[in-house]
Amino acid sequence: MIIIDDLLTKDEVTQFRQQLASVPFNDGKSTAMGMAAGVKNNGQADAQDSRVQQLANALLSKLGNNPTVISGALPQRIFPPCFNRYSESQTYGYHVDAAIMRIPNTPDVLRSDMSMTVFLTPKEDYEGGELVIQTGFGEQKVKCDAGSAILYPSSSLHKVTPVTKGERIAAITWIQSMVSDQQMRETLFQLDQSIQSLVNVGTAEREQLDGLHHVYHNLVRKFSQV
């Protein structure tokens, strides 16, 4: 799991929420596939609304230019973001995201390697509504500040606990990575973050950094599928 702090600025979060306050939300079950429909109880912004499409495009632009998203996911394709809303008592039980998704209004499909939630409601404004992800270390509960995001493997079982007070609004999307192997993708992320840390602290010689960059890019070249 990768937490991305301040993916959106406070002003951007405010703009997103103001726009979403005026768009229609449909029953989230209408977009659930398979068994997920039986445990999904939320609202989802109408993806055909031009205002929602503008917000989705704005978020896509932010994702495509975020260094942590690029490093952690190595994106090949990103699904147009969806916006959901959980009011009091609404929840989404344990489910796994579909492996293959058709990109709306195109003949293209996407393999979901990584899932992302971008939190748009300040966490102090609602109770409950935690994203719970099953990992090899047990359940991990996530509730980020507004504007922050979490990136995690799409193969994970996960749920959103019932909102007991207030309202939770978030954006969700899925990413097809150039590196489909989860373990190798995580290793590449760790290597890249270590290189960036050495660059930032200025303790490594240029020759050493060149050597590490050489290893990193050759590993990406070997394991990527484009």
UniProtKB/Swiss-Prot annotation:
Source organism: Alteromonas mediterranea (strain DSM 17117 / CIP 110805 / LMG 28347 / Deep ecotype)
Positions with a binding annotation for 2-oxoglutarate: R168
Cofactor note: Binds 1 Fe(2+) ion per subunit.
InterPro entries, sorted: Oxoglu/Fe-dep_dioxygenase_dom (IPR005123), PKHD_C (IPR041097), PKHD_hydroxylase (IPR023550), Pro_4_hyd_alph (IPR006620), Pro_4_hyd_alph_FE2OG_OXY (IPR044862)
An annotated GO BP: intracellular iron ion homeostasis
Name listed for the protein in its UniProt record: PKHD-type hydroxylase MADE_1018490
Xref: Pfam families: 2OG-FeII_Oxy_3, PKHD_C
Annotated GO MF terms: 2-oxoglutarate-dependent dioxygenase activity; iron ion binding; L-ascorbic acid binding
Key words, A-Z: Dioxygenase, Iron, Metal-binding, Oxidoreductase, Vitamin C
Keyword Glycosyltransferase in annotation: no
Domain Fe2OG dioxygenase: 77-177
Transmembrane segments: none
EC number assigned by the record: 1.14.11.-
Cofactor(s) listed in the protein's UniProt record: Fe(2+); L-ascorbate
Translocase listed as a keyword: no
Amino acids binding Fe cation: H95, D97, H158
Signal peptide: none
HAMAP family reported in the protein's UniProt record: Hydroxyl_YbiX
NCBIfam families: PRK05467.1-3, PRK05467.1-4
